[in-house]
């Protein structure tokens, strides 16, 4: 295939230096309703929440806009393209609703009712439109946090049989398009003491994922699996940042005992003087 003559490319001369700030990456928080996904995301610096569950962020001290349909979705992303210094962290709450807006618009354009199956053409058009939207979002110079509810799915095992797993409520197409951009998928849940934690390493029951290699480590360099979120979003955010910088379980150095040699020598001399008098 012939190349266009006006195309100019250059091979890199140096290795990429990864960002040290977690807010520069693309994250996914998922869990059941009212588990604290949005309130945790609202702790990130200079955030802006596009709220696809209108009213969900109204109780938070945050900057947000309720989004009601696909046309508004495209309009807000276009505005952010024009105002690239508007925020540092963009929160999409929640991403399955964005996909539903997209599919709803496709049905409308194809003259189908909401109860009608979209058919092959509908799924194909929706996939292309949604994929373009995610590309547009990912090119914005902000960190991105997507949220989703949880859902139980039956997964086939390699050796045969199935197992039920908790994962995001994203549909197959939505998940296929978005997953490749996400570095960390954290599942927010409650532990046996009824305290909130974020699981960032997957197991046979929960599909969480940590793509960071040199972060979220314990002092012995084993991976952190769960991050305690405490009793408030502020504590949760603080612990998340500490865990990212490998400081959540940092061993505290024992305090040094300072000895004043001058005073010690004076005390010894005084005791010796007293003994000589005896």
Where do the protein language model's features map onto the residues?
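Interfaces that engage single-stranded nucleic acids at replication/repair/recombination sites
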Residues: 1-35, 43-44, 48-50, 54-55, ...
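Short, basic, glycine/proline-bearing loop/turn elements
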Residues: 2, 18-27, 59-66, 115-122, ...
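Conserved catalytic network of the ASCE P-loop NTPase/AAA+ motor domain
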Residues: 21, 80-85, 136-141
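Walker A/P-loop
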Residues: 38
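Short loop/helix-cap segments at secondary-structure boundaries that form the rim of catalytic
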Residues: 41-45, 55-62, 179
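Conserved nucleotide-sensing/catalytic segment adjacent to the nucleotide-binding pocket
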Residues: 57-118
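P-loop NTPase motor core
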Residues: 96-176
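Phosphate-binding/switch region of NTP-binding enzymes
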Residues: 144-222
């Amino acid at each position: 295939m012939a190349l266009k003559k006006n195309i100019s490319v250059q091979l890199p001369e140096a290795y990429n230096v990864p960002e040290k700030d977690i807010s520069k990456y693309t994250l996914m928080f998922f869990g059941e309703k009212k588990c604290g996904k949005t309130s945790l995301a609202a702790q990130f610096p200079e955030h802006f929440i596009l709220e696809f569950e209108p009213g969900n962020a109204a109780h938070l001290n945050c900057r947000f806009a309720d989004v009601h349909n696909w046309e508004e979705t495209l309009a807000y992303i276009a505005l952010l393209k024009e105002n690239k210094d508007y925020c540092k962290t963009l929160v999409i709450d929640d991403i399955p609703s964005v996909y539903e807006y997209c599919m709803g618009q496709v049905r409308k354009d194809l003259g189908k009712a909401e109860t009608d199956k979209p058919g092959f053409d509908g799924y194909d058009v929706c996939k292309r439109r949604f994929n373009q939207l995610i590309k547009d979002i990912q090119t914005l110079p902000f960190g991105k946090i997507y949220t989703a509810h949880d859902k139980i799915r039956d997964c086939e095992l390699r050796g045969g049989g199935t197992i039920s797993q908790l994962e995001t409520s994203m549909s197959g197409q939505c998940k296929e398009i978005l997953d490749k951009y996400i570095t960390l998928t954290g599942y927010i849940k409650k532990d046996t003491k009824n305290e909130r934690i974020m699981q960032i390493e997957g197991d046979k029951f929960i599909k969480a994922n940590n793509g960071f290699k040199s972060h979220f480590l314990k002092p012995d360099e084993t991976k952190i699996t769960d991050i305690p979120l405490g009793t408030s979003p502020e504590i949760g955010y603080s612990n998340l940042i500490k865990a990212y910088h490998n400081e959540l379980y940092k061993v505290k150095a024992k305090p040094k005992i300072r000895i004043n040699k001058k005073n010690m020598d004076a005390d010894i001399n005084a005791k010796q003087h007293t003994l000589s008098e005896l």
